Amino acid sequence: MEPLKHECGVAMIRLLKPLEYYKQKYGTYLYGLNKLYLLMEKQHNRGQEGAGVGCIKMHSPAGSEYVFRERALGSGAIQEIFSSINSQLANVHINEQSNEWVESYAPFIGEVYMGHLRYSTTGRSGLNYVHPFLRRNNWCSRSLMLCGNFNMTNVDEIFNSVVEKGQHPRIYSDTVIILEQLGYALDKENNRLYHEFTEKGLDGIPRALAIEDNIDLRPVLASTAPGWDGGYVICGTLGSGDMWALRDPHGIRPAFYYYDDEVVVVASERPVIQTVFNVPRRAVNELTPGSAIIVNKAGKVSVDDILGMGRNERCSFERIYFSRGSDADIYKERKALGRNLVGKILHELDYDLAHAVFSFIPNTAEVAFIGMAEGLEKHLDRYKADRIMACNAEGTLSRDMIEKIMSQKLRIEKVAIKDIKLRTFIAEGESRNDLAAHVYDVTYGIVENDVDTLVVIDDSIVRGTTLKQSIIKMLDRLHPRKIVIVSSSPQVRYPDYYGIDMSRMGEFCAFRAVVELLKEKGMENRLEEVYNRCLEQENVDDAHLENCVKAIYAPFTDDEISAKIASMLTPDDTSAEVSIVYQSLEGLHEAVPGCPGDWYFSGNYPTPGGIRLVNRAYINYYEGNVDKR
């Protein structure tokens, strides 16, 4: 129930018509900029630590800026950025200027736009880490601006490959290193064309324009991306107007695109494009894993296979939690996740629906709650039909009996309302925990004291901190006999290294529960055995890597681990019995068949880098290096 951080959200727009066209049709030169703002605001859920905007002016004369960038930190970054841009435009009185002047000189009024929303998964903060990143050059075709939703697992290898070429990256981060890698490949492509057109007799401006017109981004991407191990959507643009977005071969990170004769659009989520451009779902395409959508200077759009499509490992957590629930498929999948838990919930209730109250916390779990309620209603309908049939067979069926049977309803209530005004940052330690317990207001009078069971569904339980410090304490104030916490996702057992902020082994309540179970069962030596096996894996080649941490969980059933988690997360002064019900892996894959990536639940990582890092995470845990990721 504690919010997870996710890296990140991307948005790109390429205008395919002259700027004057948008002024005449839409009444403003800010058409592209306004659309970028909406794309970013609609994806604000994907990043609240910072944001950045980039713009390329393709017709800026020599001596004036052609690459614009604005970045800011904090949850209000989008507003800060666009306020700054609007101030700059107000200062030049854009509405009083000619088309030619706007096209040549107006800041942030260009043909290519890039937006980024940041959530850090590395612990690094500051404006230097906010996208887009920029590699400036006074040759337009060599200037490169980059942003992405990605996390690389083999940063050391990529860094070394860059340094071995003689380059000197200023910052040790995957974004900077990839920027330099792509910049090196872009320089090679420029040099190839430089020699080609020099041999054809071109020189000066004609040669520079010929290079811009003929840049081929496919070899630039194909010469660098095969060395990347991770989940990624890498977006880039050149100063000359070329633009691309490349998705990893396994489809771990999401990307969607739309284009017509006016615009090309790329974003992290489908419904965002649908809403902002008012287009039907069928018009928005998913970017094929391993492929790049490329737009050249002339505006020609192509989708090219760069890396080949690997095994489908689309991230299931995107569907459970991160992406907006307004996507048609995601909405259906989240409902299915709730329905698939009905059997376990009924078992916890001993099939007594009359004394059960159902609700959800937080709001992101509402769709799964609807599915759960539909599944329970279906069970209740079957029960009613069976009762009517039984009474009919016994000869006791009457109108009063039918009305009594049919009157049985699920008790669905809004149990908790978040108090958005309450802040806990001024307190520390126990006093902060006490304040955290009051972040939600409870609805009194809906639970029969010491009789009813309170069933509350959440989309995921990762660390369990908020559950222990706030939610269970808050629910216990309603005096239920029992509290059942339901997770629409399976137990989160393993770190993620592809863009979700959960990379420390000791953070997970499932892992902590298993460690306690091993100690209770006298099997503590297994912890050292796994540590030694992980050390051995440090020097194993990629083909023979294995996730040794799986052995930690092997001795116990899912139910045993769930019971231990419930025990650990229940505050000492809780009066009600507490149990936790998790989604099964089978239930997950049945509900979300198109996105089988489940490594944080199963330990089955999609790339060698993930396996290597999970073993390293266990080494750090065992050695007490709690701050290492």
What are these regions (language model features)?
Residues 224-225, 240-242, 247, 259, ...:
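PRPP-dependent phosphoribosyltransferase catalytic core
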Residues 195-215, 376-396, 401-415, 421:
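Amphipathic alpha-helical
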